[in-house]
Amino acid sequence: MIFKAVRVPFKSGRFAVILNEEDASELGVREGDRVRVRYGKAGVVATVQITREIVEKGFVGLTDLASMELGISDGAEVDVFPSPKPKSVELIKKKTRGEKLSQDEIRRIVEDITNNALSEVELTAFVISSMLRGMDFDEIEWLTRSMIETGERIEFDRGTVVDKHSIGGVPGNKISLLIVPTVAAAGLLIPKTASRAITSASGTADTMEVLANVNLSVDEIKEITERVGGVIAWGGATNIAPADDKIIRVEHPLSIDPRPQLLASVMAKKGSVGAKHVVIDIPVGEGAKIEKVEVGRSLANDFIELGRRLGLNVMAAITYGGQPVGRAIGPALEAREALKTMEDRRGPSSLVEKSLGIAGILFEMTGIATNGYQHARKIFESGKTLEKFREIVAAQGGDESVKAEDVAVGDKTYTLTSQVEGAVVSVNNKSIVKIARTAGAPKDKGAGVYVHKKRGEVVKVGDPLLTIYAEKEWKLDNAIEVANTERPIVVSGMVLEVYGRRGV
């Protein structure tokens, strides 16, 4: 059937069309069915949504993504007709039955994910079946290779390419802002593609964006990395492993991160940027994504094995994840803390030691130094880390002369103080993140939390425990309410209990 196209005013990460219910009935399609939309030589397969009022009879509503793909404007005539389900739907059913998929079958599923041929329900079924039925290492390897092959790739013309990745789960993990320039200052290439926050208060890309442009193309990532040694860019601005972003989109509402997808997601991105040596940061501790050391070790071994199959030299670091890294949580606060640490050549031990430790592992993996940690510390303390970071900021369109004091943070603040004397016995990662997000992070770059006291530190009555920063008064009020409810930092007296009789 021929329809007049009209763009509908909402964005969708998938191809979708909106049909009047009478037209849908005549086409013989129902809500959630597929149709092919053809405009000249261009075409897309889209999911049907049905309405009585939004779109008139004889018109078809197209989401922004579908409109851009077809290259059409309002009023253009398009041909719409039913489209069968892709073959990968049957392959997903096969996995739900617990059967092993072949390399070609996994490739077909990934291609359909990349091309937006699967509905949200079908993609979710694939993710859930992989979690419940599992994947063996052959399947995980094939999934990873398919993710790499269906996206953009970077091939560098010179140098040794390295990379690092943290599996997340710990607030304030701004270590990439120190690791990348430290490693680049040693002559290695480190094209760090980072993520934005999904459930955290700030992803590495959110933090770096305070100081420089992170929306870089693959060509820009290559050019800058070869020129100055490294970048910190948002992976979502590229077409690197595009299936991964679509998988993450359905995992997020369910708060799941199945191991097969986690392994494939990380290693596909590392393989796509040409990395030959990779360090995986696996934070372990109370309130982290992984709370038990043995689970962290198991995951580390899986990363190493998958790397071996892909021809990548992989090492994993089990790191402490029981409380935030550094003291600042939130994009601008973290950028300021990272900058000040580089300027002063000292800072929170959790931030400095973790950053130099992981940079040192990369130095030892590549033969740069036999004692990688000491080599990384020498670079950091010499000021070369800051010098290289400023080069990277300038190459990404930022102000090369920016100082920590120049970074603006939220001007609406509230400080939570201790009501008792004693020592901090716990810092709740999840509560800290909840407060920071309620205050507006990461969308409001200046919002977040600064932790004054961490586990083991002595506290007096009235001492500040944490300060909340916000850009809007009402968000600060909401964050204060959360802070007073959650007990993000717990202080206990040094005497916990008293036994026995008092007096005579």
Curated annotation (Swiss-Prot):
It holds the Pfam family Glycos_trans_3N. It comes from the Archaea. One of its GO terms (biological process) is AMP catabolic process. Its EC number is 2.4.2.57. HAMAP family: AMP_phosphorylase. This is AMP phosphorylase 1. Gene3D superfamilies: 1.20.970.50, 2.40.40.20, Nucleoside phosphorylase/phosphoribosyltransferase catalytic domain (3.40.1030.10), Pyrimidine nucleoside phosphorylase-like, C-terminal domain (3.90.1170.30). PROSITE patterns: THYMID_PHOSPHORYLASE. Keywords: Glycosyltransferase, Transferase. GO terms for molecular function: 1,4-alpha-oligoglucan phosphorylase activity; AMP binding; pentosyltransferase activity. It is an enzyme of class 2 (transferase). It catalyses: AMP + phosphate = alpha-D-ribose 1,5-bisphosphate + adenine; CMP + phosphate = cytosine + alpha-D-ribose 1,5-bisphosphate; UMP + phosphate = alpha-D-ribose 1,5-bisphosphate + uracil. GO terms for cellular component: cytosol. AMP binds at residues 169, 195-200, 204, 265, 289. Catalyzes the conversion of AMP and phosphate to adenine and ribose 1,5-bisphosphate (R15P). Exhibits phosphorylase activity toward CMP and UMP in addition to AMP. Functions in an archaeal AMP degradation pathway, together with R15P isomerase and RubisCO. The active site is at 257 (proton donor). Belongs to the thymidine/pyrimidine-nucleoside phosphorylase family. Type 2 subfamily.
